[in-house]
Design a protein with these regions (language model features):
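Positively charged n-region of N-terminal signal peptides that target proteins for export
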Residues: 1-4
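Exported/periplasmic ABC-transporter solute-binding proteins
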Residues: 21-51, 55-74, 81-84, 88-105, ...
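Bacterial N-terminal signal peptides
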Residues: 6-18
Length: 255
């Protein structure tokens, strides 16, 4: 009987520990502009390390695509956009947690070419017959594409380059087109250019050529993890996160 009791106790303790170990972690879903992929992945891991039992699930795409997902009911806790338009649209539909929205980062718009290509050194070189294709994000859903559209209009190159434009689903697709040599050049963020060893920056667009490139962040009203979402949002504004973002080429928001 004693052996049986000991075995039963051992089994009970084992089951308790198994159940405890299998307890699901708090999962936080963060949808963010794909231009933040490397830096936000590092920041999310830092957050997990300082918040035991929390798992951050990252969903990267163009800000416009993420906006549509949220509007269609995707279970998202935190949204970080590469443009104001997408965040404004969600705000106007009362989909954001009141008081949670804030500007996080700024970026710079640049023209990149494959690293070994030397025929483009200035913006005017895009008009050359040797330049056949220029990749930009689709301005309807990609903030970088909208900024590119504004910049080309500002520099009075829209008409001259219209037939050369190749539209991409997001800014990283633009980068991939340039890296592979499928296009002669592309317009991306400075952070995208920094993330690649296969491209070089041929031109930096002046800030006045387009709307300010600001990344707003907010908690979604539908979040079922509001406390953890608030903590993650606060962490995005921390010095620890700022160091990762600056390392990736982002700039803190101008006061």
């Amino acid at each position: 009987m004693k052996k049986l009791s000991s075995l039963s106790l051992l089994l009970a303790v084992s089951l308790f520990h198994t159940a405890f170990a299998a307890e699901p972690a708090t999962e936080l879903t963060v949808s963010a502009a794909i231009s933040m992929k490397e830096s936000l992945t590092a920041v999310a891991r830092d957050f997990e390390n300082s918040h035991a039992g929390t798992k951050v699930l990252l969903n990267f795409a163009s800000s416009g695509a993420l906006q549509k997902q949220i509007e269609n009911g995707a279970p998202v806790d935190v949204f970080v956009s590469a443009g104001m338009k997408e965040m404004n649209a969600l705000d106007q539909q009362s989909l954001l947690e009141p008081g949670s929205r804030g500007d996080l980062l700024e970026n710079t718009l640049v023209l990149v070419t494959p690293k070994e290509v030397e025929k483009i050194h200035a913006l005017g070189d895009l008009q050359s017959d040797d330049v056949k294709r220029l990749a930009v994000g689709d301005p309807k859903s990609v903030p970088a594409g909208l900024y590119a559209q504004q910049a080309l209009k500002f520099t009075q190159l829209t008409a001259a380059l219209q037939s050369k434009l190749v539209l991409a689903e997001n800014v990283r697709q633009v980068l991939a087109y340039v890296e592979s040599g499928n296009v002669d050049a592309g317009i991306v963020y400075a952070t995208d250019a920094q993330a690649s060893s296969k491209v070089r920056v041929a031109f930096v667009f002046p800030a006045e050529s387009h709307e300010p490139i600001v990344y707003p962040a907010a908690v979604l009203k539908a979040s079922k993890q509001e406390k953890t979402a608030d903590e993650f949002l606060a962490f995005l504004h921390s010095e620890t996160a700022k160091q990762e973002f600056v390392k990736a080429g982002f700039q803190p928001v101008s006061k």
